[in-house]
Swiss-Prot record:
Domain CheR-type methyltransferase, residue spans: 1-280
Lineage start: Bacteria, Pseudomonadati, Pseudomonadota, Gammaproteobacteria, Vibrionales
Pfam families: CheR (PF01739), CheR_N (PF03705)
Protein name: Chemotaxis protein methyltransferase 2
Catalysed reactions, as listed in the record: L-glutamyl-[protein] + S-adenosyl-L-methionine = [protein]-L-glutamate 5-O-methyl ester + S-adenosyl-L-homocysteine
EC number: 2.1.1.80
Residues annotated as binding S-adenosyl-L-methionine: N76, T78, R82, E119, D145, N200, L201, R219, N220
Amino acid sequence: MNEIVITDTDFCRFRDYFYQKTGIFFENSKRYFVDKRLLQRIELTEHQSFRGYFTYLRFQASGEELQAVINALTVNETYFFREISQLESLVEEVLDDIVRHRPGELIRIWSMPCSSGEEPYSIVLFLLEHWPKLEQVDIEIIASDIDTGILQKAAQGIFSARSVKNLPNSSLNKYFSLRADGSYQLIDDIRQSVRFTQTNLNNRAEVQKLGAMDVIFCRNLLIYFDDISRRNAVESFYEQLNPGGVLFLGHSESMSRISSIFHVKRFRKSTGYYKPHKGKSDEKSNGR
């Protein structure tokens, strides 16, 4: 078998196609990473050239190969209690404010992308340990990702010792079981408290099907988008949030260069982006 080469033109064609489907744009600096994953897919599907493979990718009726490529090219690295200051703001300020404005109503929290589950499960554990009102308030936690393989892993709730390194021993003993290989598995009650669903943030219809949200965590995803995709994602989040809802981004991400649609919400320990109640304005729009 001749060595398959991905030319500059091939890379650009694939990059444009992948961007169209996912909103994720690969800079030239990611070329080696993309080429390596594509060559693996070409070999696994037994194609003899990039051209033949790319035709197969675009026109396969089931879309299974596109999903396989998405799974291969999305980055999934996270751990429990990452950016814990946002979780502290959630239980100390955000949820209480929502309850004041909408007493007795269901509160919905969305983790997007949820990766292998550390973020949504962290939310569950933090609520259990630090929000006394949890027993009186109905909360639904939805976790989404574009990667079907990582969603299956998340639902299993099995994590490495590195992934749980920030958890106190009391939480490990209370909510996890230690497996023979040194990994940790969440107990059934915790795993069943999160609803996992595949969602492509670039597909507005898929997002709308999830329904209205009160809090959205979208951390360290928008850095992989270009300006247009970032703006579209932020507008989609704004549409999904109930008035009074809050969006949390990653610590290295800022709304200031994306959109002015949200209002900055400075909590005691972190910063979020707020969809104001009608007729109210907490802080100036388009902050950092």
